[in-house]
């Protein structure tokens, strides 16, 4: 059976733009090499510049030229790695070398801008460090497994997050995939951590619950045999039909819901995380959704997925890596962000004894001085009294 290649993504380092150079110094083409009943994922990376290039060419032209070159590489001569992505690093060497590329000689190659470099290129190989890493299902055996083939009708909610349906029972889920746009290897650790936190928070009210893990065979699998081990393609979460709290607030639908109980629901959910030694670090209205009864559900609970600057407490806004701060500092940030969220909710409410009380609590939670900032447990205690007419005490 003849071999073939299937082009996938092309990328370039764009530092050359700031440096005023006519071309990138690093460019990569990912492809799938098919031979017989096997396939290998390969990323060919060229480090260097074409000789004599003075004017900048369009990116699509550079991609076409590089693709024309890499399709002439004899991949059968390379020691490709199975079940992963092999990166073939190409660099020009001025001295003779042993790791020379084997190329198919054609007129097309002879006319390629890479022709003058072809015989001076040395290659090294490694497992691509930027490949998408899919966790093994064996890491998360406590979660129900649903094969991707059983899911359909993907509707994108945001980057890497979809609403899907089970083809058998039509149950809706939220699917968070591992291979999100602009993927970095750290994204896999975020997925792993979220699954760990979901296990810890199983059955806890007002915290998103896992429906299972979406599984598939390893996309990088070399063999076409059917009995391949499964990997985690993504997280399946329970779907809630009420939309996000951010949408409810921006669309003026606050009074359509039992909004007075939201403050206590979010606070107790956050307190449960803190009690388990977990911080959220991205409390905001878009990370709270509403169920069919108008109750709040806290989502994105990995605690390491990133922060939103304007929702960070003042004392950590200049930190390069807020996620790496000590637990107590992160906990105080969560408390401040919760106070800001409470303030945002109250700002959409009509004036009443309850809204005035909640506004006072929000002010205490967002104190810039961390020593005088109200604690979450103090806020919960105050919230238990909302509606009975007692005013919130002053911050101290």
Roles of regions detected by a PLM:
Residues 134, 144-200, 205-208:
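ATP-binding glycine-rich loop module of kinase domains
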Residues 2-20, 41, 48-155:
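Juxta-kinase regulatory segment immediately upstream of eukaryotic protein kinase catalytic domains
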Residues 270-291:
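Catalytic-loop of the protein kinase fold
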Residues 292-364:
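C-lobe/activation-segment region of protein kinase-like
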Residues 209-256:
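Conserved structural core of kinase catalytic domains
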Residues 367-379:
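A conserved short helix/loop substructure at the end of the activation segment
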Residues 392-396:
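Regulatory extensions appended to serine/threonine kinase catalytic cores
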Residues 262-263:
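Activation segment signature within eukaryotic-like protein kinase domains
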